[in-house]
Amino acid sequence: MKSLFEQFEIDLYCIIITRFFDISITTITVYLGLLMVIVIGMYKVSLYKATIIGGNNWQHIGEMIYEFVVDLIIEQVGKPGILFFPFIMSLFLFVLTLNVMGLIPLSFTVTGQLLVTFTLAITIMIGITIWGFRIHGIKFLNIFVPSGIEPWLLPLLVFIEIMSYVLRPISLAVRLFANMLAGHLLIHIIGVAAIYLMQFYFIGILPWICVIAFMFLELGIAFLQAYVFVLLTLIYIANIINLH
């Protein structure tokens, strides 16, 4: 690997350009396809010979993820939030699986691309904003008007609230992107150092221990970032439901 950032480069495998769209196959396309195969395959296996009592290990994992997401939705939004379960479940598995896939040596980290994380974040915010207008109508704009404020302060605070709302997808995207980027760069640097120090016999073992330790740390961060991404999405949904 010539460059530290080479692992984040997007390769073009097949050029497919129509009159209106560019649907060329890139590294991101391939990994998103693998994501679909992995997630669907995991749940196909978990549902194979599924039983109410007992079941296979994959069934237990599927049930644990299901219960985790349901509890998170109820905790943050309440029972009305169950309406969003399919979306939140898909979002959590999407981010988590892509994060974990990026930990495979010599693989590509899709969530280490700001374009991907920002597109995901802005799509979510546009979607829940449209949903907010659908359920509240014009009253949805009350979300930008703080209550119990002096009239002369209102224009400034409304401006701040609007800017805060507009910047939400940016903070959501950059948080995930920056954590994935920094973690993978750190592992890469330690890995290069480990390869160089292998010539010094026992001293060369220490960096590899660090690499393994950081891999486990990154695995935890992969789950944590998926959790935080979904948690913030649920908080935004709760704000729209309650208009605050």
Curated annotation (Swiss-Prot):
Keyword Transmembrane: yes
CDD domains: ATP-synt_Fo_a_6
Swiss-Prot/TrEMBL keywords: ATP synthesis, CF(0), Hydrogen ion transport, Ion transport, Membrane, Mitochondrion, Mitochondrion inner membrane, Transmembrane, Transmembrane helix, Transport
GO CC terms: mitochondrial inner membrane; proton-transporting ATP synthase complex
GO terms for biological process, alphabetical: proton motive force-driven ATP synthesis
Membrane disposition: Multi-pass membrane protein
Transmembrane segments: 20-40, 81-101, 113-133, 140-160, 176-196, 202-222, 223-243
Protein's cellular compartments: Mitochondrion inner membrane
Any GO MF annotation of the entry: proton transmembrane transporter activity
SUBUNIT field: F-type ATPases have 2 components, CF(1) - the catalytic core - and CF(0) - the membrane proton channel. CF(1) has five subunits: alpha(3), beta(3), gamma(1), delta(1), epsilon(1). CF(0) has three main subunits: a, b and c.
Family of the protein in this entry: Belongs to the ATPase A chain family.
Protein's job: Mitochondrial membrane ATP synthase (F(1)F(0) ATP synthase or Complex V) produces ATP from ADP in the presence of a proton gradient across the membrane which is generated by electron transport complexes of the respiratory chain. F-type ATPases consist of two structural domains, F(1) - containing the extramembraneous catalytic core and F(0) - containing the membrane proton channel, linked together by a central stalk and a peripheral stalk. During catalysis, ATP synthesis in the catalytic domain of F(1) is coupled via a rotary mechanism of the central stalk subunits to proton translocation.
NCBIfam families reported for this sequence: ATP_synt_6_or_A (TIGR01131), PRK05815.2-4 (NF004482)
Protein name in UniProt: ATP synthase subunit a
Organism of derivation: Dictyostelium discoideum (Social amoeba)
Gene label: atp6
